[in-house]
Amino acid sequence: MLDTIRWDADLIRRYDLSGPRYTSYPTAVQFHEGIGPFDQLHALRDSRKAGHPLSLYVHIPFCANICYYCACNKVITKDRGRSAPYLARLVREIEIVSRHLSREQVVEQLHFGGGTPTFLSPGQLRELMSQLRTHLNLLDDDSGDYGIEIDPREADWSTMGLLRELGFNRVSLGVQDFDMEVQKAVNRMQTPEETRTIVEAARTLQYRSINLDLIYGLPKQTPDSFARTVDEVIALQPDRLSVFNYAHLPERFMPQRRINADDLPSPGQKLEMLQRTTEQLAAAGYRYIGMDHFALPDDELASAQEDGTLQRNFQGYTTHGHCDLVGLGVSAISQIGDLYSQNSSDINDYQTSLDNGQLAIRRGLHCNSDDRVRRAVIQQLICHFELAFEDIETEFGIDFRSYFAELWPDLERFAADGLIRLDAKGIDITSSGRLLVRSICMLFDRYLPSLNRQRFSRVI
């Protein structure tokens, strides 16, 4: 399952479509306002009855500085006092949620994201973790996967020591690019030394895993400059790497309007960056997990992919997909059984709801039977690059070929083009098709607009 990916420029040009990242199916685009707090409470009670383990996501939206490329839900402020009122509401949300869960439900996974979680003071971080431990069953023996996103400019050795003391054992560091011209163009000045210091601290303090985030396609980047950044990152030997494609959508994300579109690399240059990056990482011993993610062979993600247990949810690739995911904080998304739900993305609305003693769920959806079938298919393909029809047929009581009869001509074209191997038993994505797994999964997405589906069929 972990063969080296093969670069096929012709296939990539033909199948390089815009499409979902499939951290869920159906995707968040399908969320509607018919889902509210009552649905969330009902799902939490069902989770309690089933005794499901938990994965928690905690959103801290504050950033001291704006990065022009960013599309996250965030509050830009240098006023550290703004976090206190937010934390009071976050604790209130934790209290409400915990009433509908059981102390028997172990929190196997915890992730603090943002924003910049280390925007919080040491005292606030201690208090937040104390409240989580008071109301929910966090593990005390370091066996859980407890991670936090870190801006190396907002952390030092003492920060890393505190976080380790509080129970965090995984860190994800934002790097994006080490080139100074690129950093100036996106308003994120960060020296390699700042990143190296945090990596060294994480190793010394025995964090289990270090992830670094890179972005290709940023203004002022060139294939050569990005290759130098990748070399510098490889020298740091992170356990995992995320290499994201920058999507320039200034009409949707206001900070991106500060980026000069003339400074963006061409599509051809972006493809060259991706090709060289995959080659550099492969030469350095990294495995391609899928969807922009790479890991060392002894990392848990690589091991899970090899033994067939890797999963994917709103936290990305995970070994805890069996957990019910509970999102806490403004804009946070939960996945509890067949319910997807999302908190208000407006911080004032979020806080007002909790002041009134109510959860701030504003949108979401319930998966139907067809969603569950397609979710299982997409999950298997995106995590393992192969699908046994018998597994889906046994789980859902269907005949795979009959159920997806209208897709068969497209699957046969994929096979003829070399993206997949298709036979009576299943689908195997080839080494040439793995970089295009998103395009393959799009075929099974019944919610894609018909225009996109037609475009998807015509590119062959």
Swiss-Prot record:
The source organism is Pseudomonas aeruginosa (strain ATCC 15692 / DSM 22644 / CIP 104116 / JCM 14847 / LMG 12228 / 1C / PRS 101 / PAO1)
Show the InterPro entries listed in the entry. Coprogen_oxidase_HemN (IPR004558), Coproporphyrinogen-III_oxidase (IPR034505), Elp3/MiaA/NifB-like_rSAM (IPR006638), HemN_C (IPR010723), rSAM (IPR007197), rSAM_horseshoe (IPR023404)
- Identify one Pfam family in the record: Radical_SAM
Name it: Oxygen-independent coproporphyrinogen III oxidase
Please tell me where [4Fe-4S] cluster binds in this chain. C63, C67, C70
**UniProt function note:** Involved in the heme biosynthesis. Catalyzes the anaerobic oxidative decarboxylation of propionate groups of rings A and B of coproporphyrinogen III to yield the vinyl groups in protoporphyrinogen IX.
A GO molecular-function descriptor:
coproporphyrinogen oxidase activity
Instruction: Note how many cofactor molecules are bound and how.
Output: Binds 1 [4Fe-4S] cluster. The cluster is coordinated with 3 cysteines and an exchangeable S-adenosyl-L-methionine.
Q: Which cofactor does it need?
A: [4Fe-4S] cluster
Q: What class of enzyme is it?
A: oxidoreductase
Residues covered by the Radical SAM core domain: 48-287
Q: Tell me what reaction this enzyme catalyses.
A: coproporphyrinogen III + 2 S-adenosyl-L-methionine = protoporphyrinogen IX + 2 5'-deoxyadenosine + 2 L-methionine + 2 CO2
Gene ablation phenotype (knockout): Cells lacking this gene accumulate coproporphyrinogen-III both under aerobic and anaerobic conditions, however they do not exhibit any obvious growth defects. The hemN hemF double mutant do not abolish aerobic and anaerobic respiratory growth.
The family line of this record is:
Belongs to the anaerobic coproporphyrinogen-III oxidase family.
Gene Ontology CC = cytoplasm
Annotated positions binding S-adenosyl-L-methionine 1? Y57, G114, E149, I333
**Which pathway does the database say it acts in?**
Porphyrin-containing compound metabolism; protoporphyrin-IX biosynthesis; protoporphyrinogen-IX from coproporphyrinogen-III (AdoMet route): step 1/1
**What are the entry keywords?**
4Fe-4S, Cytoplasm, Iron, Iron-sulfur, Metal-binding, Oxidoreductase, Porphyrin biosynthesis, S-adenosyl-L-methionine
The yes or no answer to whether the keyword Methyltransferase is present is: no
List ligand-binding residues for S-adenosyl-L-methionine 2. Y69, G115, T116, Q176, R188, D213, A247
Q: Which SMART domains match?
A: Elp3
Provide the induction entry.
Answer: By the redox response regulator Anr under aerobic and anaerobic conditions and by Dnr only under anaerobic conditions.
Location within or outside the cell: Cytoplasm
NCBIfam families linked: hemN (TIGR00538)
Gene this chain is encoded by: hemN
Query: What EC number(s) are associated with this protein in UniProt?
Result: 1.3.98.3
Note the subunit structure: Monomer.
